[in-house]
Amino acid sequence: MFKGSIVAIVTPFKGGEVDEECYRELIEFQINNGTGAIVPCGTTGESATLSMTEHGRVIDIALDAVKGRIPVIAGAGGNSTQEAIQLTKHAKEAGADATLQVTPYYNKPTQEGLYQHFKSIADAVPLPQVIYNVPGRTGVNMLPETVARLAALPEVVAIKEASGNLGQMAEILNLAGDKITLLSGDDNLTLPVLALGGKGVISVIANIVPKDSADMVKAWEDRDISKAKELFYKLLPLSQAMFYESNPIPVKTSLSLMGRIDGEMRLPLAPMSSTNRERLAKVLKDYGLI
């Protein structure tokens, strides 16, 4: 369940509402191109701007569309432990295979606070957790020692690591590699993370090039290092372009330019600037996507 290219899928909007038909089409596109699992309602899915009702509905649509063909890892995190528990309960009741649990953001808990947060979710809902460290967004960095403590809990099975710190990721595996699966949280570090002992990536670029992302990880698994490197460096300009502006602005703009979604976002996310849109379009054109 926790390996390969896992897509942090966008949430398409149309006229201010979730575009269910388009969402289902995106999920089919992923499954047909080798994606290993779907993560609805993550950062890339604009979970922060979804109401609780919408959040639940997006998870339900994803599960109905996937129909058990690949795992669904439902985004269920929050900066309120009780809210995260509520979202996790819904994910379990709906039939999700696991949840993605981001470290609480804005309130900047201590390492003990982080441990108690994830433990409380595990105690309340017996469902596998992929814990998610992304200090650039949350304002708090979960240290390897804390991850190792959490790895002792049966529900905590994997970590999406987006600190950008390979030394920190190596220490996680050094302390708890036999108990927890490491997944890259950054497309531009997927190959280095695999080399450390990681098992895959929760990917943004898989939204637009799912097959190449999946093939890269598969090549590494097959010990075809040359092919894995070739695909990694082919993908690198796309990985970098996905952060010309805040995620998911570039990836939704890319999908719009490719004709797959409307490209609508919710405030406070605004449309991409014309300058960056031109830069992005060039990268997509060079890749052969438009």
Locate each region found by the language model.
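C-terminal alpha-helical cap/extension of soluble enzyme domains
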Residues: 4-12, 29, 33-35, 195-198, ...
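Alpha-helix N-capping/helix-start residues
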Residues: 15, 20, 52, 144, ...
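A general structural signal for well-ordered alpha-helical segments in protein cores
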Residues: 23, 55, 59, 84, ...
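Short helix-capping segments at alpha-helix termini
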Residues: 64-70, 94-95, 125-127, 151-155, ...
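Catalytic alpha/beta core domains of metabolic enzymes, predominantly
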Residues: 123, 137-239, 243
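Glycine-rich phosphate-binding "P-loop"
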Residues: 133, 155-156, 266-267
